[in-house]
Amino acid sequence: GMGDGGGCHPRDNIALRYMADELNLGYDLFDSIMNAREVQAKNIALELVQHANEHNMQIVIHGKAYKPNVEYCDGSYSLLIGHYCEEQGFVPVYVDPLTGDQYDPTEPCVFLLAHSASTTYKYTGVDNADKLYCNIPNGSVVVDPWRNYVNANCKVIHYGNTRYG
């Protein structure tokens, strides 16, 4: 999956770090969580850049808001991944109808499926089907950290899957 995010994310972690210090827990678990979030974002970006270099393709981050079905980008994990792509010289294109980011590629691209409504809202008990915000051309490379997407006409990478087969 993707790292956590949202506008409350920094504030919540500051409060949790303060609590850990006040309770003298002896270890700042919350700092470690924040560090792991950064490292994972950079690793995903490096994966996208590797495929973009290898296939000479544009990087498209499918989902810009901090979670599906909202327009808010504060604390967006997608933007953090995009930042690390830019550090490597690749400016990603974002596609997310609720943030006003429209894109309809005609050529194969490297896609990051950053949103999964079915995973994000599973706890509600309401069926939230995953939907694509744009066409994914045949021959594209699709990086899916949720490990749900299937498309025989694309190279699909279920990112983070350590159980092959």
List PLM regions with ranges.
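Structural/interface elements that position substrates and couple domains in central-metabolism enzymes
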Residues: G1-G165
